[in-house]
Amino acid sequence: MKKTIALNLIIRNYTDRSIFNIILNGCGAGGAPPYNSGNSVYVDYTFDLGGPQTLTWRDAGTGVTTTAKNPLYIREEDMPKGVRYLCIHIYPDETVELTFTVGRPVPTARGAIILKATGNE
């Protein structure tokens, strides 16, 4: 039997396009406007631990579905004690970063650079 964890999910979209139909391992995770601040929280999503994980999303302008270019893993050893949030950070080059936090997630260092460069900090 696979080991699972229930976490609150936040999505941060650092692209210049709205995206929707975000799906992590077959589980719908909503959408996000361009340069999204991560204000939407999806509560108590259950995720399989391990990997690799599959993440896809659709471009709201073109409808094109994109799959994350890099491998994604949800591992206990990457989580702080008392973890409550998984944040999915989607970047313009179609790579994704997963972060795990006890409190509400903030932009990654890479995300902060993108937001500053685009005037969306």
Where are these regions (language model features)?
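Beta-strand-rich domain onsets/edges
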Residues: M1-L7
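Surface-exposed coil/turn segments at beta-strand junctions on protein surfaces, enriched
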Residues: K2, N36, T46-D48, M79-K81, ...
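Residue-level detector of short, conserved catalytic/binding motifs and their immediate flanks
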Residues: L7-L9, Q53
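Structural motif
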Residues: L9-R17
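Conserved short hydrophobic patches within well-ordered secondary structure
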Residues: I19-I22, I88-I90
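Tryptophan-paired
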Residues: F20-G63
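Beta-strand-rich cores of mature extracytoplasmic or soluble domains
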Residues: W57-E121
